[in-house]
Amino acid sequence: SPTHARRQWSLSENGFLRYGFLNDFDKAMLALVRKYKVLEMGYAWNLQMDEGNKTIVFNHDDLVFVFNWHPENSLPDYAIQVPFPGRYKMVLTTESKRFGGKGRLDENGRFFSYPHDYEGGCRLHYMQIYNVNRAATVYKRMKG
């Protein structure tokens, strides 16, 4: 019915429902897109697709996006490919308590890439993270 199919913006202001967390995350996500000009970066580059662990990793320039859709498996020391060598910091995660997450990640942590050489002279860079189930996290390469 039209009554139930309409948008109910007041739900995000309702204290006993979790829509407020979703609204807060939406604001933070849009702020990240504006701050780092994600829409001006062109196409995203797929770095990793792990069907078994239900994880996708892609980047837009210095930003690395990690999505883990697995219903149960959180993976410590999970190696993800990164586009550039260096230090990375977490800039956004659905796991944050301010977004209704469980707070299982250290949002102030720093992550360091390491090289891996393959046959034929190919060198790729990786970093290890705690890949939390049902979470999305964004990392940014630190300059200098």
Indicate residue ranges for each PLM-predicted region:
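Carbohydrate-interacting/catalytic domains
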Residues: 1-144
